[in-house]
Amino acid sequence: MKKLLITLLMPVLLLPNIAKAADTNGDVGEQFRVLHPEVWSVGVLIDDSANLKKQWVSLQAFTGTKPGNTGQIVDIQNCSSYGTKGCESSKYFNYQAMLPYCATESAVNCISNVVATGPDGVSHKATFVEEFPGKTKYSFVGDPSANLPDSGSNFIVSIPDMPHSKGDKYLIASQLNGNKQGADPKFNTGRFQTGIYAVTIVDGRYQVPFSSIELSHYPNAYIGNTAADNSGWDYGINAMPKCAQMSETRCALAWPLPLDVDFELTFRMQVEIKGWLHGRLQDAGANISSSNGLETIKISGKPVVVPIVYKTFPRDQVPAVVTQYYANDPNFEQFGYHFGSATGQISTVKGLEQFSTGEFPEALVWYQAISDTAPYSSTAWSFRSIQSGQLGNGCNNDSSTLKGLVTTNSNMYVASPPVFNKAEQSLDYQVTSPHFLPDGSVFKGNYNLVINSDFARCIYGFTQAPISATVAVLSADGSSQVATTVLNEKNGWLRLSASNFTFSAPTIRVLLTQEAKPTPEPEMTTQAAPQSKVKRITITCAKGKLKKTLSSSNPKCPNGYKKVA
């Protein structure tokens, strides 16, 4: 099993030589980058922030060896539109698009509103500044009938009343990707991801990432693979760039986000966003509504501090806990980020970024190797999509809606919906992280679950009556931690959170309950007791020759009459 885990981690990626061992020049964590070790080394990288940075757009058509353009790749074309020469609809397609600012009321697949709310509860609407990076030579025109969005661009806004430490500019970076099989009439939506960055803009000369059309860059050469020609380059310092986003002449440098500001993004989407979202938010909120074939999605929350684990060791100084773990794995140095030339001394950095429970044991080994202390940390406001998975009771049959949002500040977590624990009748969620931050302080975790109320009721078979919940944080040994927990239900969404728990590998267990509808007591009715039949007495009374017969319960003869019978 361990061999399989390593195999799935990361394709081999050769990166340029760099003469620095680590980012030791005082850069803030928001500008973290992986640099070349000075000597032949082995190391680890556990950081999901890089996937959101330095985005690019592309629309590519693939020709394959088998019918329907499947099988091995024989040709790749960059496309500026769909269905044109070389980009015929019969081919296999991959696309990467950015979601721009909604410039008009009729614009779709865009972000219509950016709002920041301070600790005083006052909200401030952001002002659009510019598209960034703007249009590039890889931009393309979408096709709504084929569910293909325009290539778009990320953008920068200004929020003067909610500044960060270096100014009031914020980069809104949102990306959508998808694909289309040759025989399919429409594109399938793949990953949807978004981040907010506090930025300043600097001038320079940069190589921006782009999708390669060189077959040699596709090691397996099968339809469905994607490849970037490079991860970007800063010609000014001859190194990988620190930019969160860049053009050929400008760089958006990221700085710490204000942790007490709640940011809210509103998306106006024609392309459906479904399943689950996961990410880096505190006090997370989600809302979705549909009208006239469009979805309006609102995601809100505060930034969090996330540990970044990156450490390399000279090959002859790898800690024993690491060498023992990989002792029986012949592929230990075959999979990961590879640095250097083909000299036999190619440094390997293991990239743990599948975010699955299978990687947790490996992560815990590396935590031990770094004394359970994260070398870096960064503020983050981000989320991305995942599929619904199988959460029991057939409740995922409606795949057209957003089911929920799970967020945490943990270095590593399971990037899927909470697992329904049938034995405990609970929703379980696993996280793991180093115990300490770079400054030596104890790292305190948080967890937020926002789940569609109808979906939660379906899982448990609940009625529409109110739901209550308990949230327990269980340490690795099964003991329960003391944590602050919150539950509320509003506008069709259940919101639960747990905070201030410690690591290294706790499980968050959410138990939803609902009081049974009281069985009505039998209605008490009072019936009149049946009246007993009154006994009637008959007498005969006489007065001279006159006689009267009287009948009653107590008959008496009239005055002047005498009872004779």
Model-derived regions, located:
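Extended, non-transmembrane interaction/recognition domains
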Residues: 158-538
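Secretory targeting and sorting signals
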Residues: 1-22
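Processing junctions and N-termini across compartments
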Residues: 15, 73, 81, 96, ...
